[in-house]
Amino acid sequence: MRLILLGPPGAGKGTQAASIVEKYHIPHISTGDIFRYNIKQGTELGKKAKSYMDQGLLVPDEVVVEIVEDRLKKEDCENGFLLDGFPRTVVQAEALDKALVDMNISLDKVINIQVDKERLIERAVGRRICRECGATFHVQYNPSTKGALCDQCGGELYQRDDDNEETVTRRIEVYLSETTPLVEYYSSQNKLVTIDGDKKINEVFANIVTSLGSDL
């Protein structure tokens, strides 16, 4: 199963990604992770990417595609993969399509998790994180039974500085402006499946599995 996962910040993408890779026995490929890996290992691609980042420049699409393509050629991707965080633009999507053709493979589906903007803001603004163990809670949907302390370790819960309405709204708007053309691109290829992310976690996953033509 060769998949791409799309979804705005706060849509629960990370949770669903973990379930998808476990069910289909495929690697979860996050562009952030493979960038960090290549830079840490000092690979040629890592050095190339770092040279742009050190200057405060965006890494060009061709370098990003090269790094992703290199990762997709690894042995653990033989039975598929879940791409997360790439592509972000139609130009990157076209470059990825070309790279996949060169590798004699193609995408199966692009999963687009949708949640209303108001609900995304509500989710982010109510999020609380433990300073000690990193556990995540929500004041409304998943509160700690210990109030301002973590259920798991008793650590202090705090709200991230960027989990405020203004910043979250801006993040969502940037995401939508980038991703709307991408959604249209994959829709025109009949590869897009849109999933309502405003349901219980297990319901969202069940809908993803059904959309991929599988059984739970």
Swiss-Prot record:
SUPFAM superfamilies: P-loop containing nucleoside triphosphate hydrolases (SSF52540). Zn(2+) binds at C130, C133, C150, C153. GO terms for molecular function: adenylate kinase activity; ATP binding; zinc ion binding. It is found in: Cytoplasm. Pathway: Purine metabolism; AMP biosynthesis via salvage pathway; AMP from ADP: step 1/1. Residues 30-59 are annotated as: NMP. Keywords: ATP-binding, Cytoplasm, Kinase, Metal-binding, Nucleotide biosynthesis, Nucleotide-binding, Transferase, Zinc. Its EC number is 2.7.4.3. It holds the Pfam family ADK. GO terms for biological process: AMP salvage. Disulfide bonds: none annotated. Transmembrane segments: none annotated. AMP binds at T31, R36, L57, L58, V59, G85, F86, P87, R88, Q92, R160, R171. Belongs to the adenylate kinase family. NCBIfam families: adk, PRK00279.1-2, PRK00279.1-3, PRK14527.1. PANTHER family: NUCLEOTIDE KINASE. Consists of three domains, a large central CORE domain and two small peripheral domains, NMPbind and LID, which undergo movements during catalysis. The LID domain closes over the site of phosphoryl transfer upon ATP binding. Assembling and dissambling the active center during each catalytic cycle provides an effective means to prevent ATP hydrolysis. Some bacteria have evolved a zinc-coordinating structure that stabilizes the LID domain. Monomer. This is Adenylate kinase. It comes from Alkaliphilus oremlandii (strain OhILAs).
